[in-house]
Amino acid sequence: MKFNYPTGSKATTPKMSQAKVSMPPIYGKRGMSLEEELNESNAYYLSHGVAVIHKKPTPIQIVKVDYPKRSAAQIKEAYFSKASTTDYNGVYRGKYIDFDAKETTNSTSFPLSNFHEHQINHMKDCEKVGGICFTIIKFVKLNKIFLLKTKDLFQFWDSKENGGRKSIPLSVFEEQGYQLEYQMNPLIPYLKAVDKIIENL
């Protein structure tokens, strides 16, 4: 399918390859974090009846609250009440979806220290009962976003736990993951990669 931009230039939408999801070269909104970009994408999916996926609230225990005004309250002190699991969950095509989103300024690899053991265990538990889990990683300096299947994530995590390398090379994301390129709506079309995962179940 061909698209004509206001300048008169033309662009074509490449076919999706097995290794990546290719979209027209549209850049993300300046200053937005990956979380904000995903929240906007999920809002689009929800408003169009495609999927119901939300950011999980972080569980906190409020300790001290001030009331400078009767109609307003200010939280002065709070603690994380328990370890959070992953960032997002919801339902798509009748499947339970659960995933985490991370950013890194590293240009050659993704440090596994960005994950915690309870997050990995949570995703493993979800998959045991039929859930679909994955991670979305943004290499900020490269402005590249990838969806990586948990099979590949777990392989590197388990290797790290046994003395292996402590990061996932960029080449693994390029060869085994799905590259997600920005488009108009949704901003990050990650469900196209999830479609490929579902097809291979």
UniProtKB/Swiss-Prot annotation:
Protein name per the record: Holliday junction resolvase RecU
Organism (species): Pediococcus pentosaceus (strain ATCC 25745 / CCUG 21536 / LMG 10740 / 183-1w)
Cofactor binding notes: Binds 1 Mg(2+) ion per subunit.
Keyword line: Cytoplasm, DNA damage, DNA recombination, DNA repair, Endonuclease, Hydrolase, Magnesium, Metal-binding, Nuclease
Described purpose of this protein according to its UniProt entry: Endonuclease that resolves Holliday junction intermediates in genetic recombination. Cleaves mobile four-strand junctions by introducing symmetrical nicks in paired strands. Promotes annealing of linear ssDNA with homologous dsDNA. Required for DNA repair, homologous recombination and chromosome segregation.
GO biological process: chromosome segregation; DNA recombination; DNA repair
Catalytic activity: Endonucleolytic cleavage at a junction such as a reciprocal single-stranded crossover between two homologous DNA duplexes (Holliday junction)
UniProt-annotated location(s): Cytoplasm
Annotated site (Transition state stabilizer): 102
Residues binding Mg(2+): 85, 87, 100, 119
Pfam families: RecU (PF03838)
Gene name per UniProt: recU
GO annotation, cellular component aspect: cytoplasm
